[in-house]
């Protein structure tokens, strides 16, 4: 499987397992070591574990993709987070290339944290989502109105 992002083609064979997010997911992932125009980022594409040259941006995003080392979630650009994400919009405000959001790590800690590269931790204080931080993505069900990826399911092709 291959897809185009940032005007380049990447193959899943080069990166091992992959994670697919359905188009209904309301937020965005940013996972890139190369800046690119949001218009060149492909929605509904697969993101690969350890991939260093992919990006996922909302259609309304007018900023460049960022350069995170690990896959992270980011809030919509130039706006507050959607209420559908499970927390008040005041909990997450766009701050240039960084966002301030609720987050929860696998060790049980939670709260507000500023994440680099425009990343926004997934709202999890009330919904119990977790990160395999600093590795990969969520390690358990995201109990929000969005979607519930489970390790070992067809959405996860690798072990968190």
UniProtKB/Swiss-Prot annotation:
GO cellular component: cytosol; intermediate filament
Record key words, sorted: Keratin, Repeat
Any Pfam family matching the protein: PMG
InterPro entries xrefs: KRTAP_PMG (IPR007951)
Sequence repeat start-end pairs: 41-50, 51-60, 61-70, 77-86
Residues spanning the signal sequence: none
Top-level taxon of origin: Eukaryota
Region (4 X 10 AA approximate repeats): 41-86
Function field: In the hair cortex, hair keratin intermediate filaments are embedded in an interfilamentous matrix, consisting of hair keratin-associated proteins (KRTAP), which are essential for the formation of a rigid and resistant hair shaft through their extensive disulfide bond cross-linking with abundant cysteine residues of hair keratins. The matrix proteins include the high-sulfur and high-glycine-tyrosine keratins.
Family: Belongs to the PMG family.
Quaternary structure (record): Interacts with hair keratins.
Protein name (record): Keratin-associated protein 13-4
Source organism of the structure: Homo sapiens (Human)
Encoding gene per record: KRTAP13-4
């Amino acid at each position: 499987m291959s897809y185009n992002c940032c005007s380049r083609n990447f193959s899943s064979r080069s990166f091992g397992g992959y994670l697919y997010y359905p188009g209904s997911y309301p937020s965005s992932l940013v996972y890139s070591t190369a800046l690119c125009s949001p218009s060149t980022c492909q929605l509904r594409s697969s993101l690969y574990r350890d991939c260093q040259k992919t990006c996922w941006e909302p259609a309304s995003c007018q900023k460049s993709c960022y350069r995170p080392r690990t896959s992270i979630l980011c809030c919509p650009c130039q706006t507050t987070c959607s209420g559908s994400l499970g927390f008040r919009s005041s909990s997450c405000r766009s701050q240039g290339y960084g966002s301030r959001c609720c987050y929860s790590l696998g060790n049980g800690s939670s709260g507000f944290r500023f994440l680099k590269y425009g990343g926004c931790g997934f709202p999890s204080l009330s919904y119990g989502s977790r990160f395999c931080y600093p590795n990969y993505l969520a390690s358990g069900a995201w109990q929000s109105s969005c979607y519930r990826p489970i390790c070992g399911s067809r959405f996860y092709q690798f072990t968190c």
